[in-house]
Amino acid sequence: MELMRARAPAKINLTLRIEGRRADGFHDLASLVAFAGAGDLVFLHPDAPLALEVCGPTAAAAGPDDDNLVLRAARAFAERVPGARLGRFVLEKRLPVAAGLGGGSSDAAAALRLLAGLNGLALDDPRLFAAARATGSDVPVCLDPRARLMRGVGDVLSAPLALPPLSAVLVNCRVAVPTAGVFRALGLAPGAALAGPEHPAGLPETTMGNAAAVCAFLSGLPNDLEPPALALAPEIGRAMALLSEAPEARLVRMSGSGATVFALTDSCRTAASLARRLLAQQPGWWVKPTLLR
């Protein structure tokens, strides 16, 4: 069988409300997520012994191959699908690591989609979702990468949302920010709630096909992990300040637990212009104009 290929798009948290910490230590959240054109690539050589090779511009930061979520996802799949055909994966790593982009989770979800195709499973097969959930909290939402509201620990998903395409610039200052450290810095004790407004249940009808209305809606919905992430990595604040000063930026936020931040713009042209200017100012940063869907 021929080499199989799947995209693993970056997951962008347009909003992130931390509702509280459970007794088991996990955090309940509500987040409106979208997916970018930028991402990693996952390849599968069918029916070879299960293995993983990582290559690409950010491969060196991805950690040991044996710890990669791609292999964890494949093993979770095999546990739930007796006699499953597997293979050798090649992960072309393009996204920054520990960046708040859900890169590892999206890679794992792409691997599960490839294995589903190889074994004749539909994407809505409950075994696929179970394998995703066993692999990591952000993997289920990445299985079908379309804009959604995610709740719980990431395992309660809405139907796909009618989000208009949003022009954006993604910026990472090359500082890795481990998710666990940011949640620790948030400082919630088990069983405690985080004060704040309730997250909306979806997008208002006024945002249908209207990117400007989406920006206005998002402006009142912050990312609750920004303060602890900024305390751990002040460079994030510098990136946000540069974006906020740009006339093209309509909304500036941090994605996930950082350190990637994004600016929404009016068009792909203004996003590309802003990205070029930022790269000229900060040639060492990772900067990508993209579309969020």
Curated annotation (Swiss-Prot):
Q: Which positions are annotated as binding ATP? A: P96, V97, A98, A99, G100, L101, G102, G103, G104, S105, S106
Q: Can the keyword Kinase be found in this entry's annotation?
A: yes
Pathway(s) annotated for this protein in UniProt: Isoprenoid biosynthesis; isopentenyl diphosphate biosynthesis via DXP pathway; isopentenyl diphosphate from 1-deoxy-D-xylulose 5-phosphate: step 3/6
EC class? transferase
Q: Does Flavoprotein show up as a keyword for this record? A: no
Family, per entry? Belongs to the GHMP kinase family. IspE subfamily.
Functional description taken from the UniProt entry: Catalyzes the phosphorylation of the position 2 hydroxy group of 4-diphosphocytidyl-2C-methyl-D-erythritol.
Q: What is this protein called?
A: 4-diphosphocytidyl-2-C-methyl-D-erythritol kinase
